Curated annotation (Swiss-Prot):
Coiled coil: none annotated. It holds the Pfam family tRNA_Me_trans_M. SUPFAM superfamilies: Adenine nucleotide alpha hydrolases-like. This is tRNA-specific 2-thiouridylase MnmA. GO terms for biological process: tRNA wobble position uridine thiolation. One of its GO terms (molecular function) is ATP binding. The keyword Transmembrane does not apply.
Amino acid sequence: MNKIIVGLSGGVDSSTAAAILHHQGYQVEGLTLWLMKGKGQCCSEGMVDAAYICEQLDIPHHIVDTRNLFQANIVDYLVTGYSAGITPLPCSQCNKTVKFGPMLAYGREKLGIDKIATGHYARLDYDSKSDRYLLKRAIDRNKDQSYFLYDLTQYLLAGSVFPLGEMVKSETRRIAAEYGLKTADKPESQDLCLVESSGSMRAFLDKYITPHQGEIVDREGRVLGRHDGVHHYTIGQRKGLGVSAPHPLYVIDLDPAMNKVIVGDRDSATKMESTVKLVNWVSIAPPSTSIRAEVQVRYRSLPVAANIIPLGVNEEKPQDGFRVKLIFEEAVFGITPGQAAVWYEGDILLGGGIIENEK
């Protein structure tokens, strides 16, 4: 009988993934990561629900303490980024360093199981010609989470299974109800797992970064208003600026050194090109010449056609890894340092990386 570990968060998606594999005849074992050092939605109600699901399915349940790993790779990563005036993307970082890697290692080293499954909406194929696993968008484009998986290596993809990739969300809930899962009607979480259910990202960051009031200025340096902490803002933001103007204003830059938020019109918040670092080539080997693909610069943004020019590794900054230049075919709004740029050919995710702060 094939053995597999299912990462259980306590939500309907991971619960249904476990139930599907269990009913397909897999020998399933549930695994829940203990992420937060304090109270949080992901490690209270979620852990209890995950344990209940394992009891319902009559499968073992393992809890792995990854609190220190989560603190170092996610919390500290966020705080460092926001302090520097960028907007980090914790989910892709978490998937690689806290979830998939540690789960696969635990399964192989402790349980003798070399496959893991999650409730992510994504698909995997194997291309024998290139000897590579191809990461693809889910059938349910509205729920597709491949964007957050761009940083997974071939090693991690080879050990991963996504049972929900061919399903739409309504089908997931229907199957959960058919199996009588407790989580069938559980609402989806609307926040990052590290944001306490009664709080917000702003409140979370304020625990680690002391807010300092400063000036909101235009590109010419004219003072238009006051802000309550640079780390509360992100590129492209319009709401919550508290600045009166004859036309809409957007955040176009952040200067934490001078404690200033710079605003401008919408055109000032658009770009025709960007540089991306720490690139992970997923479904293809690193190209030696430019390629054309559809690039997504935020999770919910529409893909834009672009030429992707390989820059290789900067010998002066090897820590930035493989870099590329993106030349867009049309202006793109709100390109934000710290977020991921991910490129696709059709449904196939070719690669992705972190948008550089090009100051």
